[in-house]
Amino acid sequence: MRITHISDTHNKHNHLTNDLPGGDILIHSGDFTSIGRESEVRNFINWLKLRTNYTHKIFIAGNHDITFQSEKLFRLKSEWFDRKVYSDEGALGRPEWLEEILKNELDESIIYLENSSVEIGRLM
């Protein structure tokens, strides 16, 4: 089984396109965005969909992907940016657009893990 691991791409994942060897599993272990904007998340998901040289693509959110972490969203936006980047509704839970992406826009080859696991072949 061939596994490729990347992380901390901070919206620069497009620069890796020609450098990834392909294989069975691509794992991105967080910080695929700079601050978790909707446009950043959508761009990353679309990039994952185009990685057809991998059978499975697994990703988790990192500390920069703050819209995935609703409990931190309100506090971090004021600490990091000293201004409002998101509406206060994000502090009450994940933004609706993110829930919609995770529920409806991931194809069968893309797996998002949060407090969970996945078994692929004999690997877990």
Per-segment meaning from a language model:
Residues 1-3:
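Extreme N-terminal starter segment of soluble prokaryotic enzymes
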Residues 6-121:
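Core catalytic region of metal-dependent phosphoesterases/phosphodiesterases
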